[in-house]
């Protein structure tokens, strides 16, 4: 009975971010759809507490005999430490440097930011990710990417023999289910949020473009609404309070929440007048999909992956253009008929993105490449 081992190290990261969310959601769906002849287990590096990496109905996590830094260095140097299992899935580029005979390896590459926008990462982070992605396309059986945009960029910046498969993300059930408006209001009230606001969701770091959004919200033609920012602090000196003061956005119009759970995020999204996604670079943009699923209008930049995911259901603005972003947000908030049409289209489009579909596609790939590895 073959075993699929999934590396869940990202769940133990100080800031799991979107890749951590992807790991947990995908694993949960894969556990529910495991082929009868397969089993699934998880593996991490050594940590004091492995509890954050526990996924219901999946064995593990089993800790490899190295801390994260040691495991990363070992694989970076090309040492062939196989994490166990007959097939391995790496939900991030942290992956074994080569495939054992009779085994198979699939790696998810979420974006090409290290190649296209290295300045938005630390120097070491950009270099490590570039090398890890190049290893994956050279040595893994397949590389999974979330959008056609990333597939095209990957081919341009890191071509290799690995099969590149596009498998989109999904929308969690908490964003699909109906939530009583009174309950949503109660939840946002407990968080001391205003009744109406423009929302941004994501890790607070340079590539998210929050500096442009703060500047846009301070423009005289922007909607006269508060700005709510949800998400953990990442790397980089992105101080939202200082940015607000610099651009003339009154302190009372900025609300920074930090990380929230999915139940509260669902309520926050539902109560928002608009979701603003001012990113400089993205591989998918899960908040866009989640906003579409709850019926909240979206304004996003012209990053190819965001344009692809939104599919014409959001308003698109040029990256880095605060004036255009302010105007688009005003249009979404003020133009009820056009906004209602975009929201209706967004609801239909979001329904096509499910974690069950993503899990089915991943299982198809794993079974295919494991069978190929054992047919030689």
Model-identified regions with their sequence ranges:
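Carbohydrate transferase catalytic cores enriched for Leloir-type hexosyltransferases
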Residues: 1-376
């Amino acid at each position: 009975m073959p075993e699929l081992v999934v590396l869940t190290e990202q769940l133990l990261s100080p800031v799991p971010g979107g890749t951590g969310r992807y790991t947990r959601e995908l694993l949960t769906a894969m556990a529910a759809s495991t082929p009868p002849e397969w089993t699934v287990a998880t593996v991490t590096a050594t940590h004091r507490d492995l509890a954050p990496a526990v996924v219901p109905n999946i064995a593990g996590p089993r800790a490899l005999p190295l801390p994260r830094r040691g495991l990363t260095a070992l694989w970076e140097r090309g040492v062939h430490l196989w994490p166990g299992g007959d097939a391995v899935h790496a939900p991030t580029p942290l992956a074994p440097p080569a495939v054992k005979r009779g085994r198979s390896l699939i790696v998810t590459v979420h974006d090409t930011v290290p190649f296209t926008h290295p300045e938005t990462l630390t120097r070491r982070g950009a270099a490590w990710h570039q090398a890890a992605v190049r290893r994956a396309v050279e040595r893994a059986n397949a590389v999974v990417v979330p959008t056609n945009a990333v597939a095209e960029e990957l081919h341009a910046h890191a071509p290799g023999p690995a099969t590149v498969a596009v498998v989109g993300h999904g929308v969690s059930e908490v964003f699909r289910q109906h939530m009583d408006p009174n309950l949503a209001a109660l939840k946002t009230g407990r968080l001391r949020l205003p009744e109406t606001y423009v929302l941004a969701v994501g890790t607070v770091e340079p590539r998210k473009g929050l500096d442009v959004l703060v500047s846009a919200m301070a423009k005289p033609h922007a909607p006269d609404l508060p700005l709510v920012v949800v998400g953990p602090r990442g790397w980089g000196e992105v101080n939202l309070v200082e940015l607000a003061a610099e651009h003339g956005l009154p302190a009372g119009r900025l609300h920074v929440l930090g990380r929230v759970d999915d139940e509260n995020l669902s309520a926050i999204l539902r109560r928002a007048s608009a979701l603003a996604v001012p990113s400089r670079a993205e591989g998918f943009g899960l908040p866009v999909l989640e906003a579409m699923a709850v019926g909240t209008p979206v304004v996003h930049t012209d990053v190819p992956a965001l344009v692809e995911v939104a599919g014409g259901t959001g308003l698109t603005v040029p990256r880095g253009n605060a004036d255009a972003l302010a105007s688009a947000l005003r249009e979404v908030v003020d133009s009820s008929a056009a906004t209602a049409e975009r929201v209706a289209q967004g609801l239909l489009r979001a329904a096509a993105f499910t974690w069950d579909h993503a899990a089915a596609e991943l299982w198809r790939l794993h079974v295919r490449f494991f069978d190929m590895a054992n047919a030689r």
